[in-house]
Design a protein with these regions (language model features):
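Short beta-strand->loop
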Residues: 45-60
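Long, aromatic- and glycine/proline-rich binding clefts that accommodate carbohydrate-like moieties
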Residues: 49, 98-150, 157, 182
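Short, well-structured alpha-helical segments that form the helix of a local strand-helix-strand
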Residues: 20, 165-177
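A bilobed periplasmic-binding-protein/Venus flytrap-type ligand-binding module shared by bacterial periplasmic
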Residues: 61-75
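Bilobed periplasmic-binding protein-like "clamshell/Venus-flytrap" ligand-binding domains
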Residues: 89-100, 179-184
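Short amphipathic alpha-helical coupling segments at ligand-binding clamshell hinges
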Residues: 74-87, 92-96, 168
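Extracytoplasmic ligand-binding clamshell segments of periplasmic binding protein
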Residues: 1-41, 51, 78, 82, ...
């Protein structure tokens, strides 16, 4: 970097929270699922903000989806639905949000007394929820993991100066098209 305030290259996602808590990085862009851990372990004041904007706001979504597989037995499907209903109930969603930092999964979770009191005492807990007003669809396609890795690798290549952004993205686009050709 121009001012030598951070290591060259990119910072690994898996070590970012640790680096933040150890004061090795001043800002992190990470999952809301880290919020409670940061709150419990930071030995300094910190804030939470919406993602910056240029011409318009936007935020990715993603997270803990629930799936019921079609080949599951009827008994497994019923048990799965009981679990999903339990986990998404307002009280449980509120508890999960406070325990982890993830957002409550429904507006009703924010109406529970527990979560209302929590966000009153800890306003950063509603930043991600409020940012949903600007949410965009999650990148989801066939071979999502592989396509996302191509994009991540292109961004890293551009950030480290190995390729220009245009070169890196054109290369990723060609690779993604090759990967997805059989699905067209």
């Amino acid at each position: 970097s121009k001012h030598n305030v951070m290591p060259s290259g990119t910072i690994e996602w898996g070590t970012l929270r640790k680096n933040f808590l150890e004061g090795k990085t001043a800002i992190m862009w990470h999952s809301t699922g880290n919020l409670t851990t940061v709150k419990k372990n930071a030995k300094f004041d910190f804030g939470v903000a919406m993602l910056p904007e240029s011409k318009r706001r936007g935020t990715p979504t993603g997270g803990g989806n629930f799936y019921i597989f079609k080949q599951s037995s009827d008994e497994e499907k019923k048990a799965s639905m009981r679990l999903i209903k339990f986990m998404t109930s307002p009280e449980q969603a509120a508890h999960w949000s406070m325990a982890t930092g993830y957002m409550g999964v429904s507006p009703s979770s924010y109406q529970t007394e527990a979560l209302r009191n929590y966000v009153k005492d800890f306003p950063p807990a509603v930043v991600a929820r409020d940012q949903l007003n600007y949410a965009t669809a999650e990148l989801s396609t066939f071979q999502t993991g592989r396509v996302r890795k191509l994009l991540d690798d292109a961004i890293q290549s551009a950030l480290t100066g190995n390729e220009s952004p245009k070169q890196a993205l054109e290369k990723a686009q060609k690779s993604a098209e090759r990967l997805l050709r059989r699905y067209q």
